[in-house]
C-alpha cells in the first residue's frame, strides 16, 4: 500500500466536504439512501450541478452509487461510512492536541508562583 494513501484519502475527503452543498447532500444521505432526483428537489439544484457534486463525493469515496432492479436508469446514492475514518482519525489527533494545550494552559494559569502566592 502506498504510504501516501491515507493523506490522499484525507485530502480528497476534505476537498469534497469543503462545499456547503456537498455537506448538505451528505447530511441528507446520512438519514437514508436517496435518488438523485430527491436530492435535487430537496437542495433546489439543477440536475447538472447535482451530478457534478455527486461525482466529487463519489471520487472521494464518501458516497456510493447503486442501480435498482426495477429501472436500471435510476441511481440510488448512500453514504460510505468507512470513507470518513481518515477524517475522524485526523480530527481525534487535533482534539488531543487541543486537550493537551488547554491542560498546559490551565496548569500555567493556576500556578501559585505565577500568581505571587508562593511562600518560601
Residue spans of the language-model regions?
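Pre-recognition alpha-helix immediately N-terminal to the DNA-recognition helix
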Residues: 23-25
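Residues within the DNA-recognition helix of helix-turn-helix
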Residues: 53
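C-terminal regulatory/oligomerization modules of transcriptional regulators
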Residues: 1-9, 28-47, 59-64, 81-120
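Alpha-helical DNA-recognition elements
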Residues: 56
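Short helix-coil-helix linker/hinge
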Residues: 16-21
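Interfacial catalytic loop of ABC nucleotide-binding domains
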Residues: 12
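Short, Lys/Arg-rich nucleic-acid/phosphate-binding segment
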Residues: 67-76
Amino acid at each position: 500500500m502506498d504510504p501516501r494513501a491515507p493523506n490522499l484519502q484525507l485530502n480528497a475527503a476534505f476537498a469534497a466536504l469543503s462545499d456547503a452543498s456537498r455537506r448538505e447532500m451528505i447530511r441528507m444521505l446520512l438519514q437514508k439512501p436517496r435518488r438523485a432526483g430527491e436530492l435535487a428537489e430537496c437542495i433546489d439544484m439543477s440536475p447538472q450541478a447535482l451530478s457534478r457534486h455527486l461525482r466529487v463525493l463519489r471520487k472521494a469515496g464518501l458516497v456510493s452509487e447503486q442501480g435498482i432492479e426495477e429501472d436500471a436508469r435510476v441511481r440510488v446514492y448512500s453514504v460510505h461510512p468507512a470513507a470518513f475514518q481518515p477524517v475522524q482519525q485526523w480530527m481525534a489527533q487535533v482534539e488531543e492536541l487541543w486537550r493537551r494545550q488547554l491542560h498546559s494552559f490551565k496548569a500555567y494559569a493556576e500556578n501559585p508562583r505565577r500568581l505571587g502566592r508562593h511562600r518560601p
